[in-house]
Curated annotation (Swiss-Prot):
Belongs to the LpxB family. Condensation of UDP-2,3-diacylglucosamine and 2,3-diacylglucosamine-1-phosphate to form lipid A disaccharide, a precursor of lipid A, a phosphorylated glycolipid that anchors the lipopolysaccharide to the outer membrane of the cell. This is Lipid-A-disaccharide synthase. The keyword Glycosyltransferase applies. It comes from the Bacteria. It is an enzyme of class 2 (transferase). The keyword ATP-binding does not apply. Pathway: Bacterial outer membrane biogenesis; LPS lipid A biosynthesis. GO terms for cellular component: membrane. It catalyses: a lipid X + a UDP-2-N,3-O-bis[(3R)-3-hydroxyacyl]-alpha-D-glucosamine = a lipid A disaccharide + UDP + H(+).
């Protein structure tokens, strides 16, 4: 039986991995193992080597307290791969962890085929990473159509597969969703996304809650829905809401939440693409540790953090980053989107134009495309060889 070792370090990567495993198992027999979350464990029928929350970290300074734990997990993963006798290693995003593992595995198992899914954003910062990936991996799958040339010119086989949100089912019946969420006819709905990392949630909650309280002063028919990347996050958020006057609820059904909302307050990330694809206007707010921020500013070579703005070359979606991540600024702009239908409509239309450029309205299935490449070019030769030996 063909063995594939997977590594994903966060929820978005776990989702991609789970979908790819489902397609791989359609017509070939494989054994999956490695590091992943609920999607990969369910699809691959395996138990993750450890919880992905252990490596779901971001930022330069934020990682420092966990550096020795991360090193141990890298050691543990490398050892597990070498003992697994896997035929293929597939790493998904989380470059801080997956690249370090792959680099060491390459030295120990030089003949092992290795694929990385989600090309590093070398067009944004640290372009030298393209060279490093070309030295380690056999193939790279890119989510954005303009990314492959950054790697193919270095001799690395890089394929554009499309973004995973292309194969998600978005909701459009707002009337039905309002009934499902028990939202009154006169209520305005604000969706709030805080991220999947505990550190992100704790860092953004105070300013997000203050922003909402400012809005509530002039809008007492406001209902707030906090989207949960993990049901356990409700316990982290609740202490910050003990004295608030606005109505709120929690939801783990993020796509429904995005669609039912009149506007969204979002932290930077993949969620912004999902919100835009749901046809909901938003503002993006984000901050990191101060030292991490200055390091990032030295490395980064783009003006915006939201992918839609980056592609557009202009601020379609208002961004409030670091020192501008303040309740007074955020609340003013959110009120514009909640009560100025023209402003909200303009943002939605411009965002849709960018999504079309990225192919988000095509019939592509990134996970199916990835699975077919893996089967035809990386597994079929191995499967054929095994059959000949039998």
């Amino acid at each position: 039986m063909t063995k594939i070792y997977f590594i994903a370090g966060e929820t978005s990567g776990d989702f991609i991995g789970g979908r790819i495993i489902q397609h791989l198992k359609d017509n070939i027999e494989i054994k999956c193992m490695g590091v992943g979350g609920k999607y990969m464990e369910e699809a691959g029928s395996f138990k993750s080597l450890f919880s992905i929350t252990s490596i779901n970290l971001m930022g330069f300074v934020e990682i420092l307290p966990h550096i020795f734990k991360l090193k141990k997990l890298i050691d543990k993963t490398v050892e597990d791969i070498t003992n697994s006798r896997a035929d293929l290693l597939i790493t998904i995003d989380s470059p801080g962890f997956t690249y370090r593992v792959a680099k060491r595995v390459r030295k120990l198992l030089p003949k092992l085929k290795m694929i990385h899914i989600v090309a590093p954003s070398v067009w944004a910062y640290k372009e030298d990473r393209a060279v490093k990936y070309a030295q380690i991996y056999d193939c790279l799958f890119a989510l954005l159509p303009f990314e492959p040339p950054y790697f193919t010119r270095l001799g690395l086989d890089c394929r554009y597969i499309g973004h995973p949100i292309m194969e998600q089912e978005f909701y459009s019946d707002k009337v039905a969703l309002r009934k499902e969420f028990k939202i009154d006819e006169n209520e305005r709905v604000l969706c709030v996304t805080l991220g999947s990392r505990k550190g992100e949630i704790l860092r953004h909650l105070p300013v997000f809650v203050s922003s909402i309280e400012e809005i509530f002063k002039s809008c007492n028919n406001l209902k707030v829905i906090f989207t949960l990347a993990n049901p356990a996050h409700e316990a982290i958020i609740k202490p910050f809401l003990e004295d608030v006057k606005f109505n709120y609820l929690f939801s783990s059904e993020r796509l429904k939440t995005y669609a039912v909302a009149d506007a969204a307050l979002a932290k930077s990330g993949t969620n912004t693409l999902e919100i835009a694809a749901s046809g909901t206007p938003m503002i993006v707010a984000y901050k990191v540790n101060l030292i991490s921020f200055f390091i990032i500013r030295l490395l980064i070579k783009i003006k915006y953090v939201t992918l839609i703005n980056i592609i557009a070359g202009s601020e379609i979606i208002p961004e409030f980053i670091q020192f501008n991540c303040r309740a007074s600024l955020i609340s003013n702009k959110l009120q514009e989107l909640l009560f100025n239908s023209k402003k909200a409509y303009e943002q939605v239309i411009e965002s849709q134009k960018i999504l079309q450029k990225l192919g988000f309205e095509s019939n592509r299935s990134p996970s199916y495309i990835a699975a077919e490449i893996i089967k035809q070019e990386f597994l079929k030769p191995k499967i054929k060889l095994l059959k000949e030996k039998d």
